[in-house]
């Protein structure tokens, strides 16, 4: 993120303006993850994790969880509030906080390398993408493609404003911005849509929003051999 965005995020945690934090496990995660997850425990990456309780739930399912979070206050609060005494050590440009199956790298997501992150089987994104300014979202997706293997799958939860004039097909379809961001690198499956009226965070007035569950599967890059065979076929 830009230095301005980083400072704003750190300030939110210093001033405890964290209304975005959910005080329980996300119900869509507990409902749809079991069908998405590998049959055996895996390593799950949680970008921009804050102090999300979803990490506890994932660890309770037997997964190893690795998050990344810019604010040390958020990380400290996660371990303190859940009575988990962490160990801390340097890992590249990051500090790794760990207790049991849960580790959180303290630092900038955009500075994360594949070596810093380590092996990943799945990615859990609950509104990390949509929390970013639109100008940064393509960078977020490009960075994800750089640091996770092509075989990793993404469990993506989004909160989208419902368009008043949207057709039913549009409301129940893949968001246009999301399709533009992910189609080049992932196969996109929309698993669930839930339309609700919720208070507008700006003025409290009711607004209709759509909670969507996406399951993304990485596209493997074409090998040089495959490209050569395709060219021979065309000839």
From Swiss-Prot:
Key words, A-Z: Cytoplasm, Methyltransferase, S-adenosyl-L-methionine, Transferase
Chain positions covered by the region annotation Disordered: 199-235
S-adenosyl-L-methionine keyword on record: yes
Protein family membership: Belongs to the class I-like SAM-binding methyltransferase superfamily. TPMT family.
PROSITE patterns attached to this UniProt entry: SAM_MT_TPMT
GO (cellular component) term, any one: cytoplasm
Binding positions for S-adenosyl-L-methionine per the UniProt entry: 13, 48, 69, 126
Major subcellular site: cytoplasm
Gene name, Swiss-Prot/TrEMBL: tpm
Organism superkingdom: Bacteria
Family matches, as InterPro entries: SAM-dependent_MTases_sf (IPR029063), Thiopurine_S-MeTrfase (IPR025835), TPMT (IPR008854)
Descriptive protein name: Thiopurine S-methyltransferase
Gene Ontology biological process terms from the UniProt entry: methylation
EC number: 2.1.1.67
Reaction equations catalysed: S-adenosyl-L-methionine + a thiopurine = S-adenosyl-L-homocysteine + a thiopurine S-methylether
Lineage: Bacteria, Pseudomonadati, Pseudomonadota, Gammaproteobacteria, Pseudomonadales
Organism: Stutzerimonas stutzeri (strain A1501)
Biased composition (Basic and acidic residues): 226-235
Localization of this protein: Cytoplasm
One Pfam family hit: TPMT
Recorded GO MF terms: thiopurine S-methyltransferase activity
């Amino acid at each position: 993120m830009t230095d301005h965005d980083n400072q704003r995020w750190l300030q939110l945690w210093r001033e405890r303006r964290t209304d975005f934090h959910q005080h329980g496990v996300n119900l869509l995660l507990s409902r749809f993850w079991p069908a998405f997850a590998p049959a055996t425990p895996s390593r799950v990456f949680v970008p921009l994790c804050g102090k999300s309780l979803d990490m506890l739930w994932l660890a309770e399912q037997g997964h190893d969880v690795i998050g990344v979070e810019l604010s040390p206050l958020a990380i400290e609060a996660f371990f303190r509030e859940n009575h988990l005494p962490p160990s801390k050590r340097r890992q590249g440009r990051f500090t790794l906080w760990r207790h049991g199956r849960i580790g959180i790298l303290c630092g900038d997501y955009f500075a994360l390398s594949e070596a810093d992150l380590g092996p990943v089987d799945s990615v859990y994104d609950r509104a990390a993408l949509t929390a970013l300014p639109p100008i940064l979202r393509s960078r977020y997706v490009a960075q994800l493609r750089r640091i996770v293997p092509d075989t990793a799958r993404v469990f993506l939860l989004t909160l989208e404003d419902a368009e008043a004039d949207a057709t039913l097909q549009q409301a129940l379809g893949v968001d246009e911005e999301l399709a533009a961001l992910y189609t080049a690198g992932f196969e996109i499956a929309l698993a669930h849509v839930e339309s609700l009226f919720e208070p507008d965070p700006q003025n409290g007035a009711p607004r209709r929003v759509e909670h969507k569950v996406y399951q993304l599967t990485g596209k493997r890059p074409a090998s040089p051999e495959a490209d050569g065979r395709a060219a021979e076929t065309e000839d």
